[in-house]
């Protein structure tokens, strides 16, 4: 298939589908990125099974989660901020959606579809970075200069798309205008 799916999915596409929220926490033009620890809590926190966290723990990733069935992307972003990153007082933008599809690794000849919800987050000015035990590292990085090969899970593509479409966070509950 070389085109997007027809309107109105009635079942998951044969090549698979992911619906994810990404939380882009920024401070002074730097983005908070993490490296996964091989911690079983990832399954409950973000739907990240052992094979994926072991395979991708070497590189930088944007804090993210698969949405739970029926979960609002805004709630998923808050779950990332509060449960995964543990940042109190984080301010969130409204989500922006992006779609991607590419050859499926699990089903040769089929396409895998991704629906991404991008949410920007601004921590309180007095926030000091603390690394939860399910990360080996959390760090402020400049997404414009970080080399693509240092990202894991294809997150260099996610960050590139975010940079092309990002908005400014102006406060909790305030709709941010996308460019």
Set out the residue ranges of the language-model regions.
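NUDIX/MutT-family hydrolases
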Residues: 58, 116-118, 127-162
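Active-site segment of metal-dependent pyrophosphate-handling enzymes
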Residues: 86-126
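Conserved Nudix-box catalytic region and its N-terminal flanking loop in Nudix hydrolases
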Residues: 27-87
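A generic structural micro-feature
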Residues: 15, 54, 107-113, 135
């Amino acid at each position: 298939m070389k085109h997007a799916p027809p309107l109105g999915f009635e079942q998951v596409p044969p090549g698979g589908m992911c619906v994810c929220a990404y939380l882009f926490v920024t401070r002074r033009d730097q983005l908070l990125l993490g490296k996964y620890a091989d911690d079983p809590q990832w399954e409950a926190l973000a739907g990240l099974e052992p094979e994926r966290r072991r395979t991708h723990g070497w590189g930088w990733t944007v804090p993210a989660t698969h949405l739970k069935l029926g979960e609002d992307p805004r709630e998923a972003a808050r779950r990332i901020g509060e449960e995964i990153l543990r940042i109190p007082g984080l301010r969130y933008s409204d989500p922006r959606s992006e779609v991607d599809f590419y050859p499926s690794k699990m089903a040769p000849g089929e396409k895998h579809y991704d629906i991404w919800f991008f949410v920007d987050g601004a921590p309180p000015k007095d926030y000091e970075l603390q690394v939860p035990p399910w990360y080996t590292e959390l760090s402020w990085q400049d997404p414009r200069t970080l080399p693509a090969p240092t990202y894991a899970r294809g997150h260099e593509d996610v960050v590139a798309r975010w940079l092309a479409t990002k908005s400014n966070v102006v406060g909790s509950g305030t709709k941010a205008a996308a460019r």
